[in-house]
């Protein structure tokens, strides 16, 4: 547990340029506070002290606005940036050095027992407001765009965007436009553009037909 805590702190230092010192990180980063309290609650959970574990996780939720079930399994170097509104379910599994932004939900899609939450590989990034729902895997080095809704497996080294999410980048090769936390494709705007293109094509076809009709009338009048 101590090794994981040290790695969590180092991950904040490495990923956040605003982090200036270890003391500042320990005192002011609510995402780190939630992760540290999760580490403690998870230890109690593994000892089958479930009530104590859940009480600690609830205290963490009240303090930080981040809810991590103590039954979740999270690797080292986990960083929750900004943090508020993050929800991580009981059977979630998260690999090493993953990054999660505010408002993310790693949730289930049903009430059944057993595995019902996602598994994230190593070095996965999940953007702000994204929802990953179901017992499937998001592969190593994958990126989930802000506000995406992921309902099926994302292969390693891929980028997913949209509602429902689709792959836009695979193994370093662009499938569609690239994205980051700010510049991501807008599914509504893309659909609107597609409709405008179709309308423009129809207008051109109508114009050609009108010209042809005028020509036929002129020829018929001779």
Regions found by a protein language model. Give the residues of each.
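Structural signal for interior beta-strand "rungs" in well-ordered beta-sheet cores
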Residues: 61-168
